[in-house]
Curated annotation (Swiss-Prot):
Protein name: Succinate dehydrogenase cytochrome b560 subunit, mitochondrial
UniProt xrefs under PANTHER family: SUCCINATE DEHYDROGENASE CYTOCHROME B560 SUBUNIT, SUCCINATE DEHYDROGENASE CYTOCHROME B560 SUBUNIT, MITOCHONDRIAL
Cofactor(s) it depends on: heme b
Transit peptide: 1-29
Gene responsible for this protein: Sdhc
Record's function text: Membrane-anchoring subunit of succinate dehydrogenase (SDH) that is involved in complex II of the mitochondrial electron transport chain and is responsible for transferring electrons from succinate to ubiquinone (coenzyme Q). SDH also oxidizes malate to the non-canonical enol form of oxaloacetate, enol-oxaloacetate. Enol-oxaloacetate, which is a potent inhibitor of the succinate dehydrogenase activity, is further isomerized into keto-oxaloacetate.
Subunit comment: Component of complex II composed of four subunits: the flavoprotein (FP) SDHA, iron-sulfur protein (IP) SDHB, and a cytochrome b560 composed of SDHC and SDHD.
CDD domains: SQR_TypeC_SdhC (cd03499)
InterPro entries (UniProt xref): SQR/QFR_C/D (IPR034804), Succ_DH_cyt_bsu_CS (IPR018495), Succ_DH_cytb556 (IPR014314), SuccDH_FuR_B_TM-su (IPR000701)
Membrane topology (Mitochondrial intermembrane): 93-112, 167-169
Note describing how the cofactor binds: The heme b is bound between the two transmembrane subunits SDHC and SDHD.
Subcellular location: Mitochondrion inner membrane
Residue ranges crossing the lipid bilayer per the database entry: 63-92, 113-137, 145-166
Length: 169
């Protein structure tokens, strides 16, 4: 029985290769191209004067929403900062000590140095603490709306306090 089935399939495949019409008869022509569909979409949207969806002006901003945007932004800033620091360490002449001595020779005030250190460390602390918050969410903890707000406030307060402490070192 298997031999008959194998022979039938082999003959069918051989006929398909020899007769190109078998392949073409199953092809269906496309009604429109992607470019035509895109043009039709934009024409319809511009004629109806609707904003793009989702449009940011229709949302009422809340703390969890702002913290989510800031978490993404701090991740991008940290990634860019580390990449820039690594590239500058490779490409700039001298070593880290020479640049540190240059900054010390500028005789900047302690308030300016503290502020600069705070600005540098705050994104790291915020992103780290908010990342722990997201890991807790992944475990299913703290997903009720009041808990989301409370954990958001806690992350901001802890980030400010820990950044202030680290900047004071």
């Amino acid at each position: 029985m298997a031999a008959f089935l194998l022979r039938h399939v082999s003959r069918h495949c051989l006929r398909a290769h020899l007769n190109a019409q078998l392949c073409i008869r199953n092809a269906a022509p496309l009604g429109t191209t992607a470019k035509e569909e895109m043009e039709r979409f934009w024409k319809k949207n511009t004629s109806s004067n609707r904003p793009l969806s989702p449009h940011l002006t229709i949302y009422k901003w809340s703390l969890p929403m702002a913290l989510s945007v800031c978490h993404r932004g701090s991740g991008i800033a940290l990634s860019g900062g580390v990449s820039l620091f690594g590239l500058s360490a490779l490409l700039l002449p001298g070593n880290f000590e020479s640049y540190l001595m240059f900054v010390k020779s500028l005789c900047l005030g302690p308030t300016l140095i503290y502020s600069a250190k705070f600005v540098l460390v705050f994104p790291l602390m915020y992103h780290s603490l908010n990342g722990i918050r997201h890991l807790l969410w992944d475990l299913g903890k703290g997903l009720a709306i009041p808990q989301v707000w409370l954990s958001g406030v806690a992350v901001v307060v802890l980030a400010v306090l820990s950044s202030g402490g680290l900047a004071a070192l």
